[in-house]
Amino acid sequence: MASVFMCGVEDLLFSGSRFVWNLTVSTLRRWYTERLRACHQVLRTWCGLQDVYQMTEGRHCQVHLLDDRRLELLVQPKLLARELLDLVASHFNLKEKEYFGITFIDDTGQQNWLQLDHRVLDHDLPKKPGPTILHFAVRFYIESISFLKDKTTVELFFLNAKACVHKGQIEVESETIFKLAAFILQEAKGDYTSDENARKDLKTLPAFPTKTLQEHPSLAYCEDRVIEHYLKIKGLTRGQAVVQYMKIVEALPTYGVHYYAVKDKQGLPWWLGISYKGIGQYDIQDKVKPRKLFQWKQLENLYFREKKFAVEVHDPRRISVSRRTFGQSGLFVQTWYANSSLIKSIWVMAISQHQFYLDRKQSKAKIPSARSLDEIAMDLTETGTQRASKLVTLETKSQFIMASNGSLISSGSQDSEVSEEQKREKILELKKKEKLLQEKLLKKVEELKKICLREAELTGKMPKEYPLNIGEKPPQVRRRVGTAFKLDDNLLPSEEDPALQELESNFLIQQKLVEAAKKLANEPDLCKTVKKKRKQDYTDAMKKLQEIENAINEYRIRCGKKPSQKATVLPEDIIPSESSSLSDTTTYDDPSDAFTFPGQRSSSVPHSPRILPPKSLGIERIHFRKSSINEQFVDTRQSREMLSTHSSPYKTLERRPQGGRSMPTTPVLTRNAYSSSHLEPESSSQHCRQRSGSLESQSHLLSEMDSDKPFFSLSKSQRSSSTEILDDGSSYTSQSSTEYYCVTPVTGPYYTTQTLDTRTRGRRRSKKQNVSTSNSGSMPNLAQKDSLRNGVYSKSQEPPSSSYYIAGYTPYAECDFYYSGGYVYENDTEGQYSVNPSYRSSAHYGYERQRDYSRSFHEDEVDRVPHNPYATLRLPRKAAAKSEHITKNIHKALVAEHLRGWYQRASGQKDQGHSPQTSFDSDRGSQRCLGFAGLQVPCSPSSRASSYSSVSSTNASGNWRTQLTIGLSDYETPAHSSYTSCYGNVYNPLPSPSRQYTEISQLDGTDGNQLEDNLESSEQRLFWHEDSKPGTLV
């Protein structure tokens, strides 16, 4: 029992001691692990700080070159990747650097390329301790080395291909690997000597990739196969071996392709290959044959987003047949997926490869023909031996290159031996640069001289910056008319009213500007364009000055002060004929902007009567440009003058006329009196733009005139088919202002207008209170107020409504034009004026009259019977409805009476011999050709009732020595003695969307001059019959 008990106690003690020991060991181990982890953290933190500290000063990098050299660099934070590539290329004397790049392996094991425009340290370089490993390699491949210009580039391509084959980046079959290994031996060691030497050299040279050794476990078999090919190429030079090696590699399908592992939408793995040919999709087990190949010319767009890379491909086989497709047809998107860093690398590579493809495509025309491979082989053979020996000696040297802030300092690197030829090339290049810089400097000096001369012309003093050669004197500069001025010294800031003080300051400044502008405008020896522009600037300055003055007066009145009396007058030296651009371009967009005054032409569209503006507006008279027949014949166009702007705030000084009279000048009459239309031929010989004006009744004008005195318009050398001069001026006709194009004859005389001479203008001034000017030669407006808009004549530039169209006419139809001398009216009721209001004809009857009237004269065209210029022609008989018999008989009687009276007067005038009226009547001639022969113009009747103006005939008593005032409208009329054709046919069955018409007259220079002389010599007086009735012209 005792022994058993003791054994139990010993076992217990042994177990307890063992437990305590195990517990102690585990505790110590736990403490050791915790302390060790803390020590690791401290050490890691210290190393990290050391790396950060080192990053601020630069980062150590090691560049592996293609010839197995390694360059250690201290890369500074500001160093660009392009500068680093230049540094590496300088160690090879490499000229064609566009094919190469620098790559690195990031923390994920993916290959990335440095972007040349970015800093080196801005890339995601690996954060492993020690120097960062960079690789110098070929980034952009080409079809053949024959396109390379430099032999150094060819050799680097060879070294890059050899490295890619050895690393397995280019997949090659085993038999091809044995051939390539044989060329490597021939290039490095020369011809075959022995198997032992060959086997020894193969172990040192990068000949077998890992994949080949895995396929053939026996190294001796691989070496034997290489020796067999090595014996076959005995006798090849080094250059030939390199060329043959590159020919085989370039034929491989995987040459020049950058592969990236991606997945599709279904998650299946693929290889994405990017090369100079395009983008290909390969099976994960096969990099040789692509499943899909998208050439660069097929791709439309490349983009990536986070983990997705997509390309837009244009496939002509996928043309969409949907009519609702608005985008480009045949486009589809191909998408691949990977991690974000890899997707970005793929996108950068694709963009750079596509840009390289475009650059090569554009520069192919500049690239010379490819060199022969034999020539390349000879170049490589000559430099092979020297370069090989040089590379062997350099392997033993330690190399360290410092790059700081972009400046590259090399110590212990290769001292490249520059040949004399390269030195000469460098010198020539520097001389060219020097020459270009000198030329640029001379251009800058010339520009500086021009600037200094310009400054001297303005200031009168030559600046000291003017460049002078040695012994050269500064040129003498004539100072131009200065515009400098001094402000009033008494103008001091006022604390009482700063706003008024500011206005006063602006007024004084503007006043000085006006004086300066006046000086410039009065400069002699200026061309017409510059002088006109300066006068325009002067006028604008005056306008601004008047605005400031008005603002000052308004402010003073608002503040309860007395307005200042400043005389802002537009000087007389602004000649209206030279500054006519101020009035020629005046248009009224609103009737309220236009005012009408006695002796002033109204706007082309009638509007509501306005009261006279006050005198404060400063409008006392309007300047009109005088036109001459000679100028109009030279310019071959008619000029129509507009009134000067009514909103002018200046007070125009009164200019005395040459005739010594105090009345205002007569405005230029530039309208055709036959139709109150103005035919203005433009550059086109086939079309012209016509704008018809109108004469409107002004209530304020009529109120100022005596009702018992006759009211008429006076014009020289003018003809109108209407001969009424109403004695009361109570009813006027108007024609809407319309613009249209009409066909004009290709050849023929030019049509122009005549202005009133001095005597005629003087006669008119003497009868100012009885004379009214108009904007056209049309009849006064007789329309009733209820036929318009609320009794007010509205202004409109749009064509009239369709209710006023005549459905048998077209505005642009080419037809023989005829116009009987009647007027075109606004609507059905306007302008239907008759001597006896109780027998007014209907609209339909007026329209039928016009048709028959035109047809009859067209049929009688051969007769050419002369007519009295003031006679209303007899209408032919035509059967009509019974309801119209009375009206027709009335008109027939009126016409007969009218013709008898005019024939009696005409027969009485023949006895007067060579009187002024005889010349004038012969000039008047016949009215058969109111339209030009053969002229194709749009026939546009005004309404269904184009009324003809007629007058009642009375006794031929009275003095009619100067009958030119009778029947003449307010605008010019051609003075041709004879006409070549009768009335044309006005009827056209085509519909007419607008109401437009035109008239063209002829002017003969000889007759016109004769008429003008006769008119100047005659006394221009007007006599009225005592027994004339209201509305009757005799």
From Swiss-Prot:
The modification Phosphoserine is found at S372, S608, S697, S915. SMART domains: B41 (SM00295), FERM_C (SM01196). Keywords: Cell junction, Coiled coil, Cytoplasm, Cytoskeleton, Isopeptide bond, Phosphoprotein, Tight junction, Ubl conjugation. Residues 542-971 are annotated as: Necessary for adherens junction and tight junction localization. Residues 1018-1034 have a biased composition (Basic and acidic residues). GO terms for cellular component: adherens junction; bicellular tight junction; cytoplasm; cytoskeleton; extracellular space; ruffle. Residues 59-361 form the FERM domain. The keyword Cytoplasm applies. Residues 417-450, 531-561 form a coiled coil. It holds the Pfam family CUPID. Interacts with CYTH3. Interacts with PARD3. Interacts with CYTH1. Member of GRP1 signaling complexes that are acutely recruited to plasma membrane ruffles in response to insulin receptor signaling. May function as a scaffolding protein that regulates epithelial cell polarity by connecting ARF6 activation with the PAR3 complex. Plays a redundant role with FRMD4A in epithelial polarization. This is FERM domain-containing protein 4B. The gene is FRMD4B.
